[in-house]
Amino acid sequence: MAYDSNYTFPDPETSDKQGLLAIGGVLTPKRVLQAYSQGIFPWYEPGNPVLWWSPNPRLILIPNEFKISRSLKKTLKKPFKLTVDTAFQRVISYCATCSDRANKTWITSEMIETYTQLHEMGYAHSFEIWDGSELVGGLYGISLGHAFFGESMFHTITDASKVALHFLCSIMQSWNFDFIDCQLPTLHLMRLGAKIISRKEFLHMLQETLKYPDKKGNWSVN
């Protein structure tokens, strides 16, 4: 993995009660990869310094534990086209427009540039849901070892982001991935099968999954 050897993050256990661990620094692909490998992720508002987080507790989703409601089961029967890594920039741009962490836009232009570079490096991936030729839902995130770190989802029609998450879980399960990091607990994701674990347990799971080689490259699935 391409780490930033010129920067060392503090121990995640030293973060404050909200999970804030460090402030500042330049958002580069190598630094972001190093952060994820230590259970840390960037989250900040436009115009502010980069904030680095390692919350306790943490929310994860085991790929085979995704819960399908009756309404979603009906939606999954619709003739959507499902693709991977065919429209990364469009997905992250939609997510930036629709992002909703405390109803604030947090996907900055700097983040879009950095994660697009990570996509070109083979670490960041997008899952796309199409209704005909229209992109109606999707998500993106980072892959390291046998873990996928979900960043954001969007939908323009009902349940399309859930379809994207179900698609992600199906692919991750077929590749024997261990978990999807959902970062912060939300009722929405918990209803879909995500569960809360301690940061200590998360960091242990992370170190175990990082023993596997990274699945880099374009994941295009038609």
From Swiss-Prot:
GO annotation, biological process: protein catabolic process
UniProt keyword annotations, A-Z: Acyltransferase, Cytoplasm, Transferase
Reactions performed catalytically: N-terminal L-lysyl-[protein] + L-leucyl-tRNA(Leu) = N-terminal L-leucyl-L-lysyl-[protein] + tRNA(Leu) + H(+); N-terminal L-arginyl-[protein] + L-leucyl-tRNA(Leu) = N-terminal L-leucyl-L-arginyl-[protein] + tRNA(Leu) + H(+); L-phenylalanyl-tRNA(Phe) + an N-terminal L-alpha-aminoacyl-[protein] = an N-terminal L-phenylalanyl-L-alpha-aminoacyl-[protein] + tRNA(Phe)
A GO MF term: leucyl-tRNA--protein transferase activity
Protein's UniProt name: Leucyl/phenylalanyl-tRNA--protein transferase
EC assignment: 2.3.2.6
Membership in a protein family: Belongs to the L/F-transferase family.
NCBIfam families membership: aat (TIGR00667)
GO cellular component: cytoplasm
Role of this protein: Functions in the N-end rule pathway of protein degradation where it conjugates Leu, Phe and, less efficiently, Met from aminoacyl-tRNAs to the N-termini of proteins containing an N-terminal arginine or lysine.
Keyword Transferase: yes
Subcellular location(s) per record: Cytoplasm
One Pfam family cited in the UniProt record for this chain: Leu_Phe_trans
KW Transferase (keyword) present: yes
Enzyme class, first EC level, given as a word: transferase
